[in-house]
Amino acid sequence: MREVTVAATQMACSEDSRANIDKAKDLIRKCSSEGAQIILIQELFESVYFPCLNDPKNFELAKPFDNNPLLNEMSDLAKELGVVLPMSFFEQDNNTYYNSLAMIDADGKILDLSLIHILTLPTICSV
């Protein structure tokens, strides 16, 4: 039986998307250097966790799946490090918004995509 090492991370996020992505990449590199083969970064890490905030400006954070800059960047990192990255992102598909998860394989290929319609979920947090 093959042994697989999985890492799950948690980090404080800000409204600075670039800083959050860089911090996530640093965590991925650290986990990889310690032997993790599958590395999970927290849900919707590009910004503060906004689904519990009733602010229309948050819809500006959504990006389409095709040619998604975050997925492309993380795909390159997965390939470089040879790790699997389940990657959460806020997706816009026409006028529908999803809390999506792309599975990026160790060769950088996106294997699967799972979607949850973000506005149908109850608010389960408070600020």
Language model feature labels by segment:
Residues E3-E15, S100, L113:
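Active-site-proximal beta-strand elements of phosphoester/diester hydrolases
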Residues Q10, G35, P122:
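Conserved functional loop/turn residues at catalytic and ligand-binding sites
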Residues S17, R29-D107:
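Cys-nucleophile CN-hydrolase/nitrilase-fold catalytic domain and related Cys-dependent amidase chemistry
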Residues N20-I28:
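Short, acidic/polar
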Residues D107, L113-S114:
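Short hydrophobic alpha-helix segments
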Residues I116-L121:
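Conserved small/polar residues in nucleotide/adenosyl-binding loops
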